[in-house]
Amino acid sequence: MPEILINKPVEDELVESYLLYSMSVIVGRAIPDVRDGLKPVQRRILYGMYELGLKHNSPTKKSARIVGEVMGKYHPHGDAPVYDALVRMAQPFTMRYPLIEGQGNFGSIDRDPPAAMRYTEARLTRLAEEMLEDIEKNTVNMIDNFDGTLKEPEVLPSKVPNLIINGASGIAVGMATNIPPHNLSETVDALIYLIDHPEATVEELMQFIKGPDFPTGAVVVNASELKKVYEEGRGRIIVRGKVHVEDGKRVKRIVITEIPYGVSKAGLIEQIAKIAKDDESLPIRNIRDESDKRGMRIVIEIPKDANEEVIINNLYKRTALQDYFNVQMLVIDKHKRPRLMNLKGLMEAFLEHRFEVIRRRARYEYEQYTRRAHVVEGLLKAARAIGVVVDIVRNSKDVESARQSLMETLEITEEQAKAILDMRLSRLTSLEIENLQNEYSDLVRKISEVKEILEKDEKVKEIMKKEFLYLKQQYGDPRRTEVTDQSIEYNEEELIVEEDVVITLSHKGYLKSTPLNSYRSQKRGGKGITVSKLSEDDEVEFVVVAKNTSSTLFITNLGRAYVLKNYQLETTGRNTRGRHITAFLNLEDTEKIVALASLNGEGRDLVIATKSGKIKRTALKEFENATSNRGVRAIKIEPGDEIVSARVVNSEKETLIVATKMGMAIRFPVSDVRRMGRNAAGVQAIKLQPGDEVVSVDVIPPGEEGEILTVTEKGFGKRTPVQLYRIQRRGGTGLRNISDVNKTGYVVAVRYVRGDEEIVVVTRNGMMIRFPVSEIGVIGRVTKGVKLIELGDDTISKVAVVKD
């Protein structure tokens, strides 16, 4: 074989060859034709099945037979892509309106593969037959197949708006298409409206087409964005699975009955199982797939008291239960060019195609009716002169002379004469002649009708509307996908499963949050467990037990207040030290935390106590502008003084108890402390003895129920009835609260309790013990208490009370 040399720069050849290859993939493989909504392989499969006679009411044939027919005659590629395309057109979870009826295993929504083609069988659906109707009437151009031995349709006549109702997807070279499916009934209504109102806008068409209608149902949640998507032909559609909650005797069940289009059910279950395993804060107990022939049903069991909305939001955010359909309405137009069209453009192109198909069908029928009418007219002439015809035939030497004689005698054409000679004698009975006359009249009427179609555009439009209404009547069904507007952006709080956490801050500024259930409840007098892995020269300085959905107020030595959402703290294990406070709060170099207060969304005022005995009450709304990045002034600090405690109060009927390290305590009404601005210094709460200082303040609700819990640094503690602390005037010396601080050590904290709480005690070396408050005995006011924790050389630094 002689060599062929091309004298051309290789880069030029690469550009041209790759461009040809790209266009071949775009036009001949991956992008659908706007007229029938099919890619070449799909069109060839449907036409091949039509040629095999595989109609909806005929027996099915082996898929291998169909694939072989298509490959051998029209599609000279591998059998796998042909079979894959055939399978997809038969899957009810892939096609909104399947074009092939499959028999056997054609895969599943779990993405199980179909059976081999030698095992499965198929035939066309009725809807697919509607797409092929009239193809034999010269309604579309027929082109050569790959080897020029056969003809195949360039496009199908397609009475059905397949591209719109079934959508399409494909990846070509440098471009891709992704068109969502829609409801046939809605599409028909929109097409009819567009026929009557050619200037209609996309917004007007959307009165009928509400949005995509996926075969798997689900819910489109960004309805307000659909107008832009349909106007531009591109955009994002957000789809969520359909979920409801069922109440059981011991558990609640989150039930998923529909999933987003294109999502694997098995894959979704795996995703849910993974986050249930990896994220212990999500209380998912069990996941079951109860799907059957009646429909999909994925059951997620959660505790009776769990917040199902938070769990569902997490599933939307972290799994394919919420998915995105990225619309790109790229199609091949009738000039074989790739074009991005909007919704109206797709509909106009389809209507233009149907207009041309109906005209071509009318032209074909006009020719057929005219030819037949011409022949029947000749037969009627012969019937009226039957004697002459018989004489001519009997006296003619051969067929040719008989034809010539008939043409001359009856003044008919050669075609008519041939039909007369081919006519059987039985056609000359009076009944047959009457039938010919009726046929001729019918043909004249039909010719008039098709001529009107050829001459009047309005007649074509009328036919289109009738055909569309027929489709709606035969194949229309209710919408499956709900279209609505829902909140699709979550704030972080909507994803947080509420739980109690222990927030600790060390002397060196290491802040951490640990689930309270990490610390098992122990007996009073135990050794405790590690709360934080700190260095030898560091110690736990503050501890707060709160909900992870609430906030914590941090007050600094400069009198500034910062607010941090508790869920912003990374939840860690017990044996970690956490992250430095500066990673969360924008503190100045000389600024350090001196008090913490839990903000649970309730409360009216913040009470701040200082070491020197000052107390101040400020409305919480004064701190609304405080964030983790920007603090606000909370109190004016006098030189040598510092903040020791802060609490939230709800009512002026409550009372405050202020305690000192040397065992004194004073109780007075909240109303004794008037509200002040953030820049005020406060008023005197208690008159201190030399060397004494305030260590704690707490709030006592109205009434005389409950006890005052006192804990000292050497591990002693006691509960004393509230009524033993009589209400006094603010500013006095108070009452003796502990009998012998030399033995018990200085007082660390004083808290109001009811007896049904738990106490969390943290030592300077980072040990923690948690046990019920009820294990601490109720004794008198001037006593030393009982031993709460074995400390050794350690001492207690902070105390927190866990309330139900």
Curated annotation (Swiss-Prot):
More about this protein: Few gyrases are as efficient as E.coli at forming negative supercoils. Not all organisms have 2 type II topoisomerases; in organisms with a single type II topoisomerase this enzyme also has to decatenate newly replicated chromosomes.
Keyword Nucleotide-binding: yes
GO annotation, cellular component aspect: chromosome; cytoplasm; DNA topoisomerase type II (double strand cut, ATP-hydrolyzing) complex
Locus of motif GyrA-box: 522-528
Domain Topo IIA-type catalytic as annotated: residue spans: 31-495
Enzyme Commission code: 5.6.2.2
Subcellular location: Cytoplasm
The keyword Amino-acid biosynthesis is annotated on this UniProt entry: no
SUPFAM superfamilies named in the record: GyrA/ParC C-terminal domain-like (SSF101904), Type II DNA topoisomerase (SSF56719)
Molecular function terms from GO: ATP binding; DNA binding; DNA negative supercoiling activity
Entry function: A type II topoisomerase that negatively supercoils closed circular double-stranded (ds) DNA in an ATP-dependent manner to modulate DNA topology and maintain chromosomes in an underwound state. Negative supercoiling favors strand separation, and DNA replication, transcription, recombination and repair, all of which involve strand separation. Also able to catalyze the interconversion of other topological isomers of dsDNA rings, including catenanes and knotted rings. Type II topoisomerases break and join 2 DNA strands simultaneously in an ATP-dependent manner.
Entries under NCBIfam families matching the protein: gyrA, PRK05560.1, PRK05561.1
Active-site residues, as the UniProt record annotates them: 119 (o-(5'-phospho-dna)-tyrosine intermediate)
GO biological process: DNA topological change; DNA-templated DNA replication
Listed Pfam families: DNA_gyraseA_C, DNA_topoisoIV
Record-linked Gene3D superfamilies: 3.30.1360.40, DNA gyrase/topoisomerase IV, subunit A, C-terminal (2.120.10.90), Topoisomerase II, domain 5 (3.90.199.10), Topoisomerase, domain 3 (1.10.268.10)
Organism of provenance: Thermotoga maritima (strain ATCC 43589 / DSM 3109 / JCM 10099 / NBRC 100826 / MSB8)
Record-linked HAMAP family: GyrA (MF_01897)
Protein name as it appears in the record: DNA gyrase subunit A
Subunit note: Heterotetramer, composed of two GyrA and two GyrB chains. In the heterotetramer, GyrA contains the active site tyrosine that forms a transient covalent intermediate with DNA, while GyrB binds cofactors and catalyzes ATP hydrolysis.
Known catalytic reactions: ATP-dependent breakage, passage and rejoining of double-stranded DNA
Location, primary (coarse class): cytoplasm
UniProt KW keywords: ATP-binding, Cytoplasm, DNA-binding, Isomerase, Nucleotide-binding, Topoisomerase
Protein family: Belongs to the type II topoisomerase GyrA/ParC subunit family.
